[in-house]
Every structure is written in C-alpha cells, then in structure tokens.
Curated annotation (Swiss-Prot):
Entry-linked InterPro entries: Argininosuccinate_lyase (IPR009049), ATP-grasp (IPR011761), CbamoylP_synth_lsu-like_ATP-bd (IPR005479), Fumarase/histidase_N (IPR024083), Fumarate_lyase_fam (IPR000362), Fumarate_lyase_N (IPR022761), L-Aspartase-like (IPR008948)
Domain ATP-grasp: 135-333
Region (Argininosuccinate lyase): 431-927
EC class name: lyase
Protein name: Argininosuccinate lyase 2
Annotated catalysed reactions: 2-(N(omega)-L-arginino)succinate = fumarate + L-arginine
Keyword Cytoplasm: yes
Organism field: Mesorhizobium japonicum (strain LMG 29417 / CECT 9101 / MAFF 303099)
Length: 927
C-alpha cells in the first residue's frame, strides 16, 4: 500500500474548534522557539487570536518552518535580556513576551519583567534551568529526588561512581528534550556520556555545558504533571503516563492522559507535583513536572519552567476540548487564566523514531485517520537527512488518539503510528551495491562459524571497546593531519563523524553483523557516513594488531584504576571502623585457636595494610603502562613518517613502544594485572571466611544487619550472611581468569595471535566484574557489621590467652623463656576443664602472681611491640595507615588527572581541526 503523506497535517497543525479571532489585539513577541512540536503552532495560534506575531532569534537557520511562518522575523542576541528589551520597545502595542524553548525562557522572562509584562520570576526560572541548583532547592524542601551529583571533569565522574551505585543517569545541567541524557551501567559508559553531554548543547543551540549532572537511576513507571501557576494558585491540567524508547536514551515515544491510576492517586500526585513547583518559587505560567513512582512513593526527576513539549499540549487540547496553547498565550498577554473543565475524554500520543541514520527517501501513513485520530503529522521531510541523536530529534512522525476510554485512545494512536511507512537510504546501502574490493570484502565467513565466533554487535557488551576505538582514531587522525599524511579536510570530516558516533552511543552499530570483528564493522559505518574515499585514510600506517594491543592496554588501565578506587573505598570503610573498634578486646586467633587478646581494630588494620600493598601493586602496574603500541602496525612498524610519540601522548601514554614486535606480541601487563586481581580476591576471600566464621553461634563475635543477610526457605530461625559466600565465590572467577589468560598465552608465538589478543585478554572483564562485586560487598559488610562486645570478652574469660604475656614477663625477670613457657604450660594443663572460665582464670592468676596481667586490657596493651594490638601500637599503626591512605589517594588522583588532561588535550585538538575546516569552508575554500 502506498503511504499517505498527509501534506496538510504539518507538524504543529491544530484544529480550529478551539476558537480564534483575527481582530487586532496588539503584538506578541516569541523569543526563539521549539524547533519541533508546538513552537510553530504557538505562533499560528497567536496570529489567529488577533496578535501581530514576531519571532526574535539569533539564528534563523534553526527554524525550517520560517519559510511559511505567520511570524515576522527579527534577528538579535536572544541570550541577552537587554537586547530583547531593545527589540520589545520597538514593537507597538506589545501585549506579551514568551518563549517555548527551555534555553531562552529565563531571558524572555527577564525582558518581560523589565517591560512590565506578565512573566514568571526570572530567578526562579534560573534555579529551575540549572538542574543542580534545582536539585539542591528541592532537597532543601525535603522533596524526594534521586541522589544527585555535579561533575565538571572525568575525575569527578570517577569519584562519583566510586561512591555511587550503577546504573546512573548522565545529563547536561541545563539541557532539554532528552538531549545528552544517557542511562549508564558502567564507568566507561558514564565517562562517554559525560563527554557527549558536554558538547550536545553546543551543537544544538551554541551554548556551552561545562557542568554535567549525574543522578542515581530510579526504577519505576514515569509520569508527568502539567501545571499552570496563576494568581497564587497552582492548577494541574492533568497527570500523564510516559512511554520511552529503548535505553540508554530517554526519548519519549508516547503519553497517555489521564494516567491509568485511581482518582485519589491522581489527586495526590497533582498535589505532590505542585509542591515541587511551589518549592522552586514558580508562581506564574506553565510548568512541566517529571517524576517516577517507586515502591516507596513518587520521586521528582525534574521540573521544567515551561509548557510541555513533544506535542503534549496538542493532545491535551483535543482531550480537554479547549486549546492549551491559546490558554498560555492569553495568560502571557495579561488576559488571565480560567482552568479547563474536567475532562470527559481520554487522549494518547505516539511517536515513531527513525530506525537509522541516512537520507529519508519516503515517509507517510498508509491509512487515513479515523474519527478517533484527530491529528497525525510528519516531523521530517522527504529528501532530508536523518541523524540518530538519541533525543527528540529522532522523532519522524506522531499520531494523537482521543476517545472516551484511555485504552481506545491509545489503540487509535497506535494503529495510526503503526501504519507509518518509512524508507531511509543509508550510505551503507550504497556501498553494499559496490563490488567488494581487494581487502576484507573478499572474505565471507561461513555462517556457522560467524554464529559461533562473531555474534552481532551489542552496545551493552561492545560499547566500552568502541569508545576506546574512537579515542584511538581521534589521536591517530590528529597525528596524521599534523604530519601532513592526511589532508586536514579529510581528517576533520572523519573526526566529525566519529564525534557523531560517540554522541549517539554507537547505536547505529547495535545488532550489526561483525564477521571480521567489531573494528571493521565500525570502520564500515564511518565509510557509510564519510564516504569510502575519506574513510580509506583512517587506517593509514596502522593495523588491527597495534590497534588491538592499544585497546587492550586502555581497557586494562581503566580496569586497574577502577579496582584501585574500590580498594580505596574499602580502606576508607576499614579506617572508619578502626577508630571505634580499637578500644574493644577480642580474641586474636592462630589456626582457629585463641592465641592472645587483641582487638577488632587491630584485625581491620591488618586487612587495611594488606589491601594497601595490593593497591600499591596496581599503582605500579599503571605506572608501567607507559608505552603505546600505536605505530607498530602488524608487528613491523611502517614506512610512513608518523609521530608515534604524539599519538601516545594524546592517549595518555608517556612514550611509544620501542620495539614493534614487542608492542603487538606482549600481554605481560594483562597477566600481571590479572595476577594482582587474583591476589586481591584471595585476600578478600580469606577475610570473608573469617567474618563468616565469626557470625556463627559458636564464635558470635560479629553480627551483620538484616539487609546484608538472608533467610532460609525451610529453617525459620536461620540468618544467613550469604553475601560473604559471594565474596568467597568471586575469588574462583578471578583466579580462574588469570589461569585462563596464562594458559592461552603460554603456547602462543611471540607475535600477534588470536590466542594472545583474544583469549589472553578477554578474561579481564569477567575478572574485573567479579572483583568489583567482591570489593563492594566487602565494603558494605565492613560498614554494616556490629561487634558483639560481650561475646568477645567471654571467649577470653578463662585467662589462657594471657599466659604468653606471663611467660614473657617471667623471661624479663631472668627465667629462660623456654623454661617459663614449660612451667606455665604445665600449670595450664592441670586446670580442671570442669571449672567455669572465671575460676580457671582466678587459678592462673593465683599461681602466676606478679606476672599474670590484671585485666584483658592490660594484657592487650602490653602487646605494643612488633605491630601488636596494644593501644600505643594501634595508635601508631592508625597514624601510618592514614598517611599511606592519603598518599595513595593523591597518587591515584594524579594518574587519573594525567589521563584526563591527555583526553581533554586530544578533544581540544579534534575540535580545533573541525573548527578550522568549517572556517575554511565558510570562506569558500573547502576541500
């Protein structure tokens, strides 16, 4: 069936029944606008209401609809309220100033206030627009929000993730329309999201976004509340249920009104959302409140000081029977506000997202709308380019359904949007028609072999590798351009497409077949976007061999740093507990036998120092990863006059590899790293073994809280500290990963090989995940466990643990230690086990008068030499531990800062090349 293009239903069309008048009511100034959705429609409605309509913008090219717009165009700097006031004073009979764009509502409000026109408080809008300030203000008013952090550097991101729990949401502090918002389930994804979020607003509206928000991801169904503030009251137009596209993006693909909840719940949610609006000081105009309903109640995600986007007002207008857009225009024109009557109808809106990037060959609906679909429209034009951005710009069409029941309205919208026919021609489609060249195209892997060895790309699995691949490409292209081996025009074009791929989270590669590996699939996508001629320069003077070797070191570097940070968190938890636990008395064991009086603090310090050595080994490993393999090619270098030192420094290495064969053949850093991981997991397993034994009734030295334990499916009395078993079990995975990698490597030739580059390196991810899990669980247990003080003392009550001190005191009085040891041993053997512990201790004190310690504390504190648990010794150990901890934290921060500086320098060089090329093109000398 041929698609029906619905030419008349352009985006932003609105049915006429909502009223209108062409009488002259003065002028109305729009400051910038939504580029899709209701932006154009607001201007049309203002004109129909009788206003002379003006649009002031700093960049008319942002608005394709201006060709047919009813608005008169004014060019000015719209980020400056003073310039806006200058524009406004020249308009006769100005009734109102309004902006439908998140980015300009503050400036528009400031200008309106200066002109004495209706407006929201500009300071309140500024607080809302800065989502970090918004979060702080909502917290101050005890309104539930996700745990929120501010990040201005990669180091900030790493520190946040070290103390937070994945997944997290990364987004610009002042963004809109889901632009730059990403769900991140790994540190690599969060860092990539951070980098992408910093540049996304520059690309959209030429606004920098140096500050990035990181929020704990909140699980639950998402909703929004549409609120109008007027005359001291907050009016909720409705609660809507939200539908989102696939993660990691947050593109909204549908809304249902009213949300399918009971009426009391809807009223409570309206009150909840209004509370957030009130807390932020928004006393005039529309507010769009987004929230999630969790098991413990609703949580505010963000409050936007403007009318909802995404055609929500159009759908609400049809459902409520009155134009929300007219309502807002009249409000800002000073004509007041009358709340709409209660809805007798339900509404739903559905969007279709572009499935891929490319040229839009055809787009249209294959069915006519029925009476339950009052509006459907296209958001893209045939012949135009579509680029997947992971935000509102990915939408290509919408359909509104309205009916008496929500199910019927949703079904109508679904039917209409499902009838959309879309045909996008990707550059890859064109390249597929070409005959394969003499390179990789000659090789077609057998389908069975491909199924086993080359599964389709999964971003959740391969995204980390792709991020490193893109970073290497950036450094390599900058070097090639600087050396004059590739034209700056070709390098800049390729770099722009690489940035696009990064911004999109490589989503265009999701599900892509990769018969010869992820890299060649990635390169094919670049060729599809930039053209095979330009993309063909990317692989100059390099091979997959030096690429893979470099990626493996970047992955190892990242993993080792991440584990080091987790060790730091565990050490911090240990030090916290040492402070409170050093004054307690507890058994010190030797082969599960009570040996001496010690303290929990002494034990925890022992674990701290052992972890500290492991962390130092990791730091030494990171310092050793100094040579970058790039430039080694397939193992024999290259004849091209490259600058490997420049590539190395841009990637955070200190120098290139000295020997090309060593560069591609060696994976000793991996084996070393895996061996350190194995050693750490062994230590954690031993600690977990102790703690598990100490939770038993027979020992009863510690207890773990209920939220770190489990019950039994059969035994009602059982409290199972099963997390400790996970820590012990993780060791088998980590140790196994080392054995697997060493076994894969030991019989491989000293050159590039699949055994080394694949099987020798792939266990790292499994090892890192298992060790991360063990470290996090260890930190939780250490923080949460409690000490059973009475039980600890009871185990020492019989005095036997004090006899070693008595023997040493006898030796200090001239009796040979072996003789004293024998005498006390004989006394201890004669004690009756039938007597109670107190009687046995009393008997020992009687027979060893003068040398037997008076108390357990005296005995423990006597052990002050050789790093014992005595108070003076423990205080000294704690002081040393704190110093070591601070020094290592600084060392780790320095090395992370070095990498971040290299990355920022590389990104700066990339931007410099791209900007220079753009400038050249504008001058008409584009190559």
């Amino acid at each position: 069936m041929e698609p029906i293009p619905l030419e008349a239903e352009k985006p932003g069309s609105c049915p006429e029944p909502f009223g209108g008048s062409l009488m002259n009511r003065g002028s109305f100034l729009f400051v910038e606008s939504n580029t899709t959705g209701t932006g154009e429609l607001l201007m049309k409605r203002a004109r129909l209401l009788g206003f002379e309509t003006y649009l002031v913008t700093r960049n008319p090219a942002r608005y394709p609809f201006l060709r047919d717009s009813v608005a008169q165009l004014i060019e000015a700097e719209t980020r400056s309220p003073d310039e806006l006031v200058g524009v406004a004073t020249k308009l006769s009979g100005l009734a109102g100033i309004y902006s439908s764009s998140d980015y300009f509502v503050e400036a528009a409000s400031s200008a309106a206030m200066a002109m004495g026109l209706p407006a929201a408080n500009a300071r309140a809008i500024a607080t809302c627009r800065n989502k970090w300030k918004q979060a702080t203000e909502l917290q101050r008013h005890s309104i539930p929000i996700p745990e929120t952090w501010l990040a201005t550097s990669i180091r900030d991101v790493e520190n946040i993730l070290a103390h937070g729990t994945l997944p997290v949401v990364v987004k610009p502090v002042s963004g809109s329309g889901s632009s730059g918002v990403r769900l991140c389930d790994s540190a690599a994804a969060a860092i990539a999201g951070f980098n992408s979020a910093k540049s996304v607003l520059q690309d959209q509206v030429d606004l920098p976004s140096p500050d990035i928000l990181i929020q704990q991801y909140v699980e639950g169904k998402e909703y929004s509340a549409e609120i109008i503030a007027y005359d001291g009251k907050l009016h909720c137009l409705g609660i809507l249920a939200k539908h989102k596209g696939p993660p990691p993006c947050f593109v909204e693909v549908g809304h249902d009104f009213p949300a399918p909840l009971l009426e009391p719940s809807l009223q409570e949610l309206a009150s909840f959302a209004s509370g957030a609006v009130s807390a932020l000081g928004l006393e005039f105009g529309p507010a769009h409140v987004e929230f999630v309903i969790t098991e413990s109640g609703p949580v505010i995600i963000e409050v936007n000081p403007r009318l909802a986007g995404g055609m929500i007002p159009v759908m609400l207008s049809h459902a409520l029977g009155t134009s929300i857009l007219d309502m807002v225009i009249r409000l800002y024109a000073g004509e007041g506000f009358t709340p709409p009557r209660g809805s007798a109808r339900a509404g739903a809106i559905r969007f279709r997202l572009a499935p891929t990037s490319g040229k839009l060959k055809s787009l249209g609906f294959s069915r006519n709308p029925d009476p339950t679909v009052p509006e459907a429209g296209l958001l893209k034009s045939e012949g135009g380019d579509v680029q997947i951005k992971g935000d509102f710009r990915d939408r290509v069409a919408y359909a509104v359904g309205v009916a008496d029941e929500l199910d019927a309205a949703a079904a109508a919208a679904d039917r209409m949007i499902d009838s959309l026919v879309i045909d996008i021609e990707t550059a890859a489609d064109e390249s597929d028609k070409q005959d394969p060249g003499p390179g990789e195209g000659r090789w077609a892997l057998h389908p069975e072999a491909m199924k086993l060895l080359a599964p389709p790309i999964e971003i959740s699995r391969d995204g980390r590798l792709l991020q490193h691949q893109a970073a290497i490409d950036e450094a390599h292209l900058v070097m090639l351009a600087d050396q004059g081996l590739v034209s700056q025009a070709a390098a800049a074009d390729l770099l722009k497409h690489i940035l696009d791929l990064q911004d999109e989270g490589f989503q265009s590669l999701e599900g892509r077949d990769a018969p010869r590996g992820v890299y060649l699939a990635y390169e094919a996508e670049l060729a599809a976007r930039a053209g095979p001629e330009k993309a063909g320069w990317l692989h100059l003077a390099r091979s997959r061999n030096d690429l893979n070797a470099t990626i493996s070191l970047l992955v190892l570097r990242e993993a080792a740093c991440s584990i080091s940070q987790q060790i730091g968190i565990a050490q911090g938890a240990l030090l916290q507990r040492v402070e409170e636990a050093s004054s307690l008395v507890a058994p010190l064991y030797s082969q599960y036998q009570i040996a001496l009086p010690g303290s929990p603090g002494h034990y925890l310090l022992g674990v701290f120092f052992a972890l500290g050595r492991e962390r130092q080994r990791l730091h030494s490993l990171l310092e050793d990863i100094r040579n970058c393999p790039m430039g080694a090619g397939a193992g024999g270098g290259t004849s091209m006059p490259i600058d490997p030192l420049k590539t190395a420094s841009l990637l955070g290495f200190e120098e290139p590899s000295f020997n090309s064969l060593d560069a591609v053949a060696s994976r000793d850093h991996h084996l070393h790293g895996l061996s350190i991981f194995a050693s750490i997991s062994t230590l954690l397993s031993r600690v977990a073994q102790d703690l598990q034994v100490w939770t038993t009734r027979e020992f009863a030295l510690i207890d773990v809280p209920r939220n770190l334990a489990g019950g039994s499916s059969m035994l009602p009395q059982k409290k199972n500290p099963f997390l400790l078993e996970h820590i012990k079990g993780s060791a088998s995975t980590v140790i196994g990963a080392y054995v697997s990698a060493a076994t894969a490597t030991c019989k491989a030739p000293f050159s590039n090989s699949i055994e080394v580059s694949n099987y020798g390196c792939s266990p790292l991810r499994l090892s890192e995940e298992a060790l991360q899990r063990a470290l996090i669980l260890t930190s939780l247990i250490v923080k949460g466990m409690s000490f059973n003080v009475r039980s600890m003392r009871d185990h020492l009550e019989d005095g036997s643990s004090m006899t070693a001190i008595a023997a040493e005191r006898m030796a200090s009085r001239g009796i040979p230690f072996r003789e004293a040891h024998t005498q006390i041993g004989e006394i201890a053997q004669r004690l009756s086990q039938d007597d109670c512990a107190t009687q046995r201790r009393s008997e020992l004190a009687s027979q060893l008068a003068g040398v037997f310690p008076v108390s357990l504390e005296e005995c423990r504190d006597a052990l002050q030499f050789g790093g014992g648990p005595g108070k003076r010794s423990t205080d000294d150990q704690l002081s040393v531990a704190k110093t070591h901890f601070r020094e290592m934290e600084l060392k780790c921060a320095e090395i992370s800062e070095r990498w971040a500086h290299a990355e920022a320098h590389c990104k700066g060089r990339v931007k410099e090349l791209i900007d220079k090329h753009r400038s050249t093109c504008r001058s008409g000398v584009c190559g």
